Design a protein with these regions (language model features):
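Strand-loop-strand
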Residues: 5-14, 28, 32-351
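Acidic, carboxylate-rich catalytic segments that either coordinate divalent cations
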Residues: 24
Length: 351
């Protein structure tokens, strides 16, 4: 499966050729039937419309040519492939698609990403086939629902509680590594807008019991070249969502992600910077001595910072409606507040 891109299917038609073999002039028409553009390493299969394609003066003409991925909304292509010089074939096409189902992947044991991704796309690709330049705009639509599994994620705290917070995958068996050849000769720049209704679930372990369920949006820029590979920059702001999180001493909790949390991409698409605060409300009795106590509402949770590969986790607690207790919490160090937060999350008590 070294081949990056190939074609399968049937085509029939008539061609007229004249001139020297080194400089053929070709005219004619080809009818495609059940023809596909496929990339085995990347799991892509796109069906060509069963339409005639004209060849004029050694130019393959795309005239409102349609390609289909996973639904009946086509990618529309206009332009030409000029093979007057076989050694230097030139492509010049414009592409557009609306509500295009770009990804439709079911979960399996090797899945890193699965679900459905719907997009609008406008773009152009130009240049010699060996050195193409692509620019465009990709809008990820609100009906998108994707899951991304971080199988190797190991989250640790930046307080003194390191040993409490480790995720380990105990499943045996060596993972299967899929070798994907690099895309040679392509320079790409895509503006990406993610609709605020798009739903992306980021699983923090292989069995998906710990996860961050993201609702949000943002504007990102995605670049690709064969030297640097793929890069993403921009900010994905969270306006909603849940985080499910368990620790050796804390039962599985569901926290609410606070508005204004965000994920910022600085190049590496697999290692963004995190700024996520996720909390839950806890009501508990605070002992005032002599066996008396009063009921207090606390906001308790976790704050994720630093990068996805090496995140910092801080446990947080506050009592916004009780000034006396809040003053008491303010005098403590981050570590002391963290221990109070962990105790509260584990036992429901303020100690």
């Amino acid at each position: 499966h070294d081949q990056l891109i190939g074609m399968k299917g049937y085509g029939e038609g008539a061609l007229k050729m004249k001139g020297a073999l080194s400089n053929l002039d070709i005219d004619g028409e080809v009818y495609l039937d059940s023809a596909y553009l496929v990339s085995v390493p990347y799991g892509i299969s796109m069906r060509f419309a069963n339409d005639p394609v004209r060849i004029t003066d050694s130019k393959l003409l795309f005239e409102n040519f349609m390609m289909y991925a996973n639904n009946e909304s086509p990618l529309n292509i206009q332009g030409s492939l000029d093979f007057t010089n076989i050694e230097k074939m030139m492509l010049d096409i414009r592409m557009r698609a609306q509500n295009f189902l770009l990804i439709d992947a079911k979960e399996n044991a090797r899945s890193e990403a699965f679900g459905k991704a719907y997009v609008n796309f406008y773009g152009a690709m130009r240049g010699p086939v060996s050195n193409l330049k692509m620019q465009g705009k990709l809008d990820v639509l609100g009906n998108t629902d994707m899951t991304y599994v971080l199988k190797e994620s190991e989250l640790t705290t930046d307080t003194q509680l390191d040993e409490l917070v480790k995720f380990t995958n105990f499943k045996s068996g060596k993972p299967v590594v899929v070798e994907r050849p690099a895309l040679e000769g392509l320079n790409m720049m895509l503006g990406m807008s993610i609709d605020e209704s798009a739903h992306i679930l980021c699983a923090l372990n292989a069995d998906q019991t710990n996860y961050i369920d993201l609702m949000g949006g943002g504007d990102l820029t995605m670049t690709y070249n064969s030297v640097d590979g793929i890069g993403i920059t921009g900010k994905y702001t969270l306006n909603n969502g849940k985080m499910k999180y368990s620790l050796p001493v804390i039962p599985l909790k569901t926290f609410d992600i606070q508005d204004g949390s965000y994920i910022e991409f600085n190049g590496d698409p697999f290692n963004p910077t995190l700024n996520i605060t996720a909390t839950e409300n806890v009501r508990t009795t605070v002992n005032e001595g002599q066996g008396t106590g009063r009921s207090v509402d606390f906001i308790c949770g976790v704050k994720l910072s630093q990068t996805l590969n090496k995140p910092g986790i801080q446990f947080i607690v506050s009592s916004p409606n009780d000034a006396t207790l809040q003053d008491e919490l303010n005098t403590m160090s981050i570590e002391e507040r963290g221990k109070i937060a962990i105790t509260m999350l584990a036992s429901g008590m303020y100690l």
